[in-house]
Every structure is written in C-alpha cells, then in structure tokens.
Amino acid sequence: MSFRADRIYLEFLRLTRRLSNQQIMMLLAVVVGVLAGLGTYLFEMLLHGIKSGLIRWFPVDSAHILFLIYPAVGIILATLFVKYIVRDNISEGVTRVLYAMSRRNSRIARHNCWTSIVGGATTIGFGGSVGPEAPIVLTGAAIGSNIGRLARLNYKHTTLLLCCGAGAALAAIFKAPITGVVFVLEILMLDITAGSVIPLLIASITATTMAFMLRGFDPILAVTLAPADAFELWQIPLFILLGVLCGLMAWYFTSMNSRVGAFFKSIDKQYKKWLWGGAILGILIFVFPPLYGEGYEGFTSLMHGNAQELFNNSLFYRFRDIDWVIILFVIATMFFKVIAMSTTNTAGGVGGTFAPSLFVGAFTGASLALVCNTLFGWEVSIVSFTLVGMAGVMSGVMNAPLTSIFLIAELSNGYGLFIPLMITACISFAVDYYLDPDSIYTKQLRQKGELLTHDKDQSVFVFLKLEELMETDFLRIKENMTLGDIVHIISTARRNIFPVIDNFGRLIGVVQLDDLREDMFKHEKYGHPISDYMIPPPDKIIEHEAILSVMEKFEDKHAWMLPVVDKQGRYLGFISKSRILNAYREQLVKIQQ
C-alpha cells in the first residue's frame, strides 16, 4: 500500500510540477467535487432503491404491520455492518468531521469514503428517522482528507480539502452550491481567507454540476412560490412569533436528543438497544408514517398544500379531512420526530440530524399557519411558513443562521422570502443560544475540550494533547522516607520538585528543593520525616484533561508546574506552563504554513 501511495505521489508531482500551490489546490478541489458528486449519487440511488422496494406497494388507506418491523431490521443490519465490517464509529458524521480536524490532523479513515454510504442508506431505507446529509458530509470529507493524504499536503491544505469535500457533498445532495460553501465557513472552517474560499466554491460548483448531470435539475424539494405566497409587511409579527417557536423547538430538539442518548447509553447490552430501539421506532412509525426515513415527502406535502397526504398508511386516514385532526397530527408528528431520530442514532443506526431539523422546522411553520387559518380565518401561506420554519429550527439546532437562510433561499428558487427568513432564523438562533449555547454538533466536543472554534487562539489549544506534553522524569519520594533517605536521591536529580506518593502510588504532596536546602547539611535533622517538608500542590491535573482547562488552572493558581494524576489519584507526571506555551507557538506556525 505504501509503494502504491509513493507511485501516486510521484505521478502527482510530475503532473503538477509547473503549477503554483493555489493552482494545485484548485485542481484538487475539482477532483474532490467530482468524487463527492459521485458519492452522493450512489448514496441517493441505494437509499431510494431500498426504500422504494420496501414500501411502494403499501395501500395508502390503511396502516401496514411491516412499519413495526422494518426499522428494527434496518438498525440491526446497520449495527452488524459497523461492528463486523467497518469496526469503527461512523455515526454523527458532522461531529466526526469536527473531531478529525481537532484531534486527528484532519485525517479521516479511507473506509469512510464508502462505509457511511452503505450504513446510512441501509438505516434510512428501512425507515430510520434520520437524515442522509451527515453520512454524505462524512463521505465527502473523507474523500477530501484522503486526497490530501495521497498528495502529502500539510495540515492546512489537507483541512481545506476536507472542507471542500464536506461542502461539495452537501451542495450535491441539495443541489445548492452556495449552501455548501456557507455551511463550511459557518460550521467547519477555522481560518477563512480568500485563498480558501476559491477552492470551496470550485468543489461545490463541481459537485452540484455532477448532481445535475446524474440526477437532473429537479431540486430535492420541488417548490415554487406563487404570488399568494409573497411576503407582506403585516406578517412580520407572525414571523417573529415563528422565530421564538422555532428557537424553543430547536432547544427541545437538542435537549431531547441528549436525553434519549443518555437513556440508550445506560443500556449495557447491544441486543437490548436493538429491542428498545426497534420497538420505539416501529411503534412511532406505525402510528405516524411521515416519520419513516428522512421525511422529505412529509414536508413536501405540506408545502404543496396537501396535508391530507400525511395520513397515507396511517391509522387516522379516515380523519384526514378534519381540520383540527390535521393540526393535532402535524404537531404530534413534529414532537415525535425528534424522539424517532434520536432513537435511530443511539440504538445503532447511521444518520444525521440535518434533515430531521428541516422536518421539525417545516412542521412548526405549518402548524402556526394552520392554526392562524383555521382558528382565526386568516389567509396565511402554508408554503411560506413551512419554508421559513425549516430555516428557523435548523438555525437553532445547528447554530448556523446563514446556512439555513441560504439553503431555503436556494431551494425555493429565489430570494422572495429573504426578509422573513432572516427574521425567523436570527430570532430562533438567539432564543436557542440563550437556552443552550452549544449546537447539536458541538455539545459533546466542547464538554471534552475537543472543539475547534472561530477563535483561533482557543482553537490552537485544542490541538495540544496533555499526554504528549506531560513530563515524567521526576524522582519519586515515598511518604515514609526521612530527610536522610532522600538527600542522596536529590543529589543526582535534575529537577527541583519531587512528588511524594503513598504505597499505592497516589500523590499526597510535593517537596521543593528550596525547602530542603537549609537542612540538607544538618545531619541531626536527617531523622525528620519528609512530611515536615511536604506541601500540597496548588492544584492537580487529571489525565486526558483538555489543555484549555489546564491553562485555566495555571492562571487561577498562578502556578508554572502542576502534577498530573489519574482518576484514582495515582501520580503520572508533571505538566509545565512553559512547555504548553512552546507547543502552542509550534502548533500556530504549523497551522499557518
């Protein structure tokens, strides 16, 4: 494999020897865009092939018992695929990309170029209530990362290609090139320059062109705004209200996802997760069929004014023409979508939260429009409120108002709703950020100190690892030693601080050389226990603790050296502030190269 990689690299050098670095990156961006577009096409074909073969023959006027079975089968197949073939974590695609950027030098395993396609399509095709975007983004990012690896690019350029792949994949699946670029700039990229934007644009345009060639020009959500759907000034209070509702729904989305995840993590056996996940998901889809799969058909029906189609294959099919039943059904589906999505992901399925956030947003906007039209007799456009609601919830869930605004603007073939999109997306973002400042992608990474942000100073610290900076060449002193016992020990020491440990290796204090100097040559004091000279450390660092947290302890305690212990309190080594700062400077140079 290494020999093959060397040959590819030499051929790459031969072909590009007369090109500048910028031209090489533009050329590689085209390659990434083409491959990301092909990957998206394969994903779509596999997904719709599975889904169509399983449910297209169901009668629309009654529920089908297979809705109880399909989701469990999909979760089991996806879990077995991941456990026995992939043997790696391919869930939470966007989070995995962020983790690779912060902890793996933007290196993503080669298998991610195809395994997310198989796992995601299997999960969603069998009814898993998740979105295809996260697996496809991980696929595109893996393509970019591995092309960067083959070309032996540095960290900065590899990261740029990774982002090109992620943005290109998203652009291809929605046929929305601007959205792909904005998504990367808003969520993924740390260092934004003119030189990085051009390859992003090229990759997104190339992938979108591939999508047009392979799948036609029809958008994923075929909707055209009619004159009756145009924005009017009197609707501004309603869009403000919609923004608040979307912010609350975004907070519910994120918090419920965490709660369901915690529930499944408390289950010790995988087969129990299958049983619980299959049962919960099967029952929800049996009662609310719009929850099957990514859910695009559901909010497409709403945007076309065909809310009755939501009742196809439902137990409530006979009540589809009753207005208040429609409203209750839409609201219930909206809330249960989050539970269905979280259950799918945490029970073993492979998928993302992108499409579910659009689904919940669409149903939130449609609910408000239906209530206004039914209860108050107003003529509010369900199409407009459905589209704007999609942007609202997505803005809050992902903490990405610009991505949500441009996505809906591109999907609706124009910017007629730009003002309400901006109003609702910004208010939703503000409400959700007030309730929970982390997005659904960043919550776990921030808690672990592994999140890259647009604050470059903080982000550089994320790259540093405690175990790589810890120093271990300190002479240890046992707690039962006397001054006489350690005089000969410290005479050969290169350090001026010594950890004191008990018989179990636990750190109980430290001894500083300066505190011993006065008595070192007084033989009458050699019998004094070392505890007479021992002091407690200013603070302790726990193994694997984030460097940002370590620096905060240094600042709080005004210290320059702190001991590192494991979770049981056993001594491991010391970490110095000066070594962290030196590593920080080296990492900053590496990023900027």
Give, region by region, the residue ranges found by the protein language model.
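Structural signal for short hydrophobic segments within the conserved structured cores
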Residues: 473-477, 532, 537-540
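Alpha-helical transmembrane segments and immediately membrane-proximal extracytoplasmic
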Residues: 1-468, 472-473, 477-498, 502-508, ...
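The conserved cystathionine-beta-synthase
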Residues: 477-494, 500-501, 520-523, 540-560, ...
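Ca2+-coordinating acidic residues in Ca2+-binding motifs
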Residues: 142, 512-515, 576-579
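Glycine-rich acetyl-CoA-binding "A-motif" of GNAT/NAT acetyltransferases
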Residues: 507-510, 571-574
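PAS and related sensory helical modules
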Residues: 526-531
